[in-house]
């Protein structure tokens, strides 16, 4: 990339329960803290990339797997408008089906609080990070972006179908055989039913 006159910036964002946690006591927040981290990072790039030889009006946002899905979220977010000119989504499409409503995210946050045995959010926040992460592990690491009505205004697939997204250039691709890592020799019919219910709930009874 350096030989092609590209300035590459790698960013970090909060993950799992730390990046995508919602709770009734956080009603004034989106719960999509990881995506907010990414937006701050993109704004930093836009404000400072010229000092490194980059063009603030020619930013390409690239992500793979969950990162690819995050490119989609910000592409369809009103708050992401103007942060980047082009997007590259690599193996991120399956994540578009894995969305949660704000109410369900709040319920999940309350479940995590109960699992940790604390009375309120503030007490939960004072726990060691490892303890909080263990609660997420016990729940199967279910924390991800939620439809908060602000940063993510609606179901992403619906926004894309409606044409409600920012006008950017886009490349979409997939890694060959990427999902082989998830193949399990002991898959049961019940496992398949759970996958259908998670990603295609409208077809769970067919």
Residue ranges of model-derived segments:
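Substrate-gating cap/lid region and adjacent catalytic-acid/histidine neighborhood
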Residues: 123, 129-206
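Serine-hydrolase-like catalytic core of hydrolytic proteins
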Residues: 1-121, 159-183
């Amino acid at each position: 990339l350096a030989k092609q006159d590209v300035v590459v910036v790698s960013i970090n964002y909060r993950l799992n329960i730390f990046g995508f946690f919602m709770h009734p006591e956080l009603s004034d927040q989106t719960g999509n803290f990881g995506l907010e981290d990414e937006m701050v990072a993109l704004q930093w790039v836009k404000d400072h990339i010229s000092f490194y030889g980059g063009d603030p009006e020619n930013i390409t946002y690239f992500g793979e797997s969950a990162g690819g899905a995050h490119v989609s979220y910000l592409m369809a977010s009103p708050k992401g408008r103007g942060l980047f000119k082009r997007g590259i989504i690599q193996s991120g499409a399956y994540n578009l089906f894995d969305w949660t409503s704000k109410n369900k995210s709040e319920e999940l946050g309350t479940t995590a609080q109960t699992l940790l045995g604390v009375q309120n959010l503030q007490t939960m926040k004072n726990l060691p990070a490892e303890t909080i992460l263990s609660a997420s592990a016990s729940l199967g690491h279910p924390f991800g972006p939620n439809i908060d009505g602000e940063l993510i205004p609606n179901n992403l697939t619906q926004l894309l179908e409606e044409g409600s997204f920012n006008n950017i250039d886009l490349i979409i691709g997939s890694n060959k055989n990427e999902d082989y890592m998830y193949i399990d020799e002991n898959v049961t019919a019940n496992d398949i039913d759970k996958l259908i219910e998670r990603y295609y709930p409208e077809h769970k009874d067919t």
